[in-house]
Amino acid sequence: MENISDLWNSALKELEKKVSKPSYETWLKSTTAHNLKKDVLTITAPNEFARDWLESHYSELISETLYDLTGAKLAIRFIIPQSQAEEEIDLPPSKPNAAQDDSNHLPQSMLNPKYTFDTFVIGSGNRFAHAASLAVAEAPAKAYNPLFIYGGVGLGKTHLMHAIGHYVIEHNPNAKVVYLSSEKFTNEFINSIRDNKAVDFRNKYRNVDVLLIDDIQFLAGKEQTQEEFFHTFNALHEESKQIVISSDRPPKEIPTLEDRLRSRFEWGLITDITPPDLETRIAILRKKAKAEGLDIPNEVMLYIANQIDSNIRELEGALIRVVAYSSLINKDINADLAAEALKDIIPNSKPKIISIYDIQKAVGDVYQVKLEDFKAKKRTKSVAFPRQIAMYLSRELTDSSLPKIGEEFGGRDHTTVIHAHEKISKLLKTDTQLQKQVEEINDILK
């Protein structure tokens, strides 16, 4: 059979004819052939989402295409780059049971390669937590010990913990770094008691340089596990080993947490992560799009960022959903398509976020005024009056301050905005024609 790279390139040429251009560009173009073993062709996808999408939507089509090219029935398997090492020919172990031995740090699969300081987007809601995490990574057990990070789901706590682990290992390859969830700690502890291996369990977690333990709130109510973790904490702290803990709430709010554990969690630094603001959400989307090789218009990223303000996971998930929807219906990505793609996951009760630009555009459409005229020095009634209406609506429909509104209207003073608001408010009480025009503008903005 021909070289697998040549075979796959031939298959791609055929697949390009069978699927839409957006589908090919999004899902197939960036794939490569990894290997061919025992009638199984392994294809490398650029990321996890693409791998899953290819498996569920294109496996059959790819198999048929390869059959047409080779006359052989090949099974298709998709992998992502970091899992390729698992597919290589197994080498003899350097010593018996090497696979079961504890290594100096966790396997690559345990520390997510995507979760580094370089890929973390810094914003007002996580700036302090990021700085504290970096300080801990640069000087384990010398800056803040323990470091306790808390915040809601999907805000970046786990990302920072993995980033600390990666940084420590990169700068000290011999460091013993362990990351695990409190649930895993609990399960291993229970199993160690059952199997009479308590000593092995203690040695495993009390002889590390950095312990990263996620979701510590799950220890609540587990008295024996809390007892074990208390002694593990003490053993590490006394040896000046770094401990990093995450939770969905601060120590004082974790129910049924022993006071002695709570006090130890408060020995070091407690920092929180809050939901990202609009600017940070846009930056997160841009970084995600760049990482996935996606070309997303700015208006679409702004729309998604305005609609999804809960956490980073949902934000990135919304972006991928829009890309997938675009591919399925074979249409270019724009704000309207994004709205259609996300209609099922955006609560109906969530009000539309209206910007001053939106208001200027709507008023301009109704009164035939160019956008640039709202910021110009023109004082003719045909421009000045619509400008006052736009200022009035900006005050009513946005959270912008008076100076901010004035700035968006050519740098006018805030007193000008106040005057416009008072004037239009007064006219609306008696002028029925103006009432209808403002109602029309509101309809456009809905």
UniProtKB/Swiss-Prot annotation:
Residues 327-446 are annotated as: Domain IV, binds dsDNA. Residues 93-109 are annotated as: Domain II. Oligomerizes as a right-handed, spiral filament on DNA at oriC. It is found in: Cytoplasm. This is Chromosomal replication initiator protein DnaA. One of its GO terms (molecular function) is lipid binding. The lineage of its organism: Bacteria, Bacillati, Bacillota, Bacilli, Bacillales. PANTHER family: CHROMOSOMAL REPLICATION INITIATOR PROTEIN DNAA. GO terms for biological process: DNA replication initiation; regulation of DNA replication. Plays an essential role in the initiation and regulation of chromosomal replication. ATP-DnaA binds to the origin of replication (oriC) to initiate formation of the DNA replication initiation complex once per cell cycle. Binds the DnaA box (a 9 base pair repeat at the origin) and separates the double-stranded (ds)DNA. Forms a right-handed helical filament on oriC DNA; dsDNA binds to the exterior of the filament while single-stranded (ss)DNA is stabiized in the filament's interior. Belongs to the DnaA family. The keyword Nucleotidyltransferase does not apply. GO terms for cellular component: cytoplasm; plasma membrane. Domain I is involved in oligomerization and binding regulators, domain II is flexibile and of varying length in different bacteria, domain III forms the AAA+ region, while domain IV binds dsDNA. Signal peptide: none annotated. Residues 1-92 are annotated as: Domain I, interacts with DnaA modulators. Residues 110-326 are annotated as: Domain III, AAA+ region.
